Each structure stands twice: as structure tokens, then as C-alpha cells.
């Protein structure tokens, strides 16, 4: 079951999804496997419309980890896009 982000809410779908690292390239893979299970971890990034805990609404680049059978975990906002 996928963990939901704690510090922000997704208001739309995630676009421009890219894989940053996979397998041994994911530095936190041992921690992730120990806490959530799964084997084939990938670090991902994408852009989504979000609302953060301060009430700000807009597009932001977000990063997360995912594995087959586990889902998406450990979400982070990396960059906010302002007009």
C-alpha cells in the first residue's frame, strides 16, 4: 500500500515522471527494504499540482521512492515553480 505524503497533498496527477536511480544506484535501498520490504527500488521525480502545509497551491517538482508491490513512499518537495 502506497504511503501518502505528509507535508503536502497531491491535487492532480504526476506528470513528466522520470527515473533518477534504480537498483544499486538508490543509496537508501537497504533502509527502504528493511522498513517497507520490496527489492527493486527506484528513485523517481515528477511535476504535480500540490497544496503544502502552509496552504500554498502550485506546481512543484517532487521526488519519491517506489518498488513493485510496495508503491510510492518517502515523498519530498524539491522545487516550487512560481509564475
Specify the residue positions occupied by each region the protein language model found.
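Cysteine-centric segments in proteins
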Residues: 1-83
Amino acid at each position: 500500500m502506497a504511503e501518502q505524503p505528509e507535508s503536502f497533498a497531491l491535487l492532480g496527477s504526476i506528470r513528466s515522471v522520470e527515473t533518477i536511480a534504480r537498483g544499486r544506484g538508490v543509496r537508501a535501498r537497504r533502509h527502504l527494504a528493511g522498513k517497507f520490504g520490496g527489492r527493486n527500488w527506484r528513485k523517481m521525480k515528477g511535476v504535480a499540482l500540490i497544496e503544502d502545509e502552509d496552504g500554498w497551491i502550485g506546481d512543484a517538482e517532487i521526488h519519491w521512492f517506489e518498488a513493485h508491490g510496495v508503491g510510492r513512499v518517502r515523498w519530498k518537495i524539491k522545487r516550487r515553480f512560481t509564475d
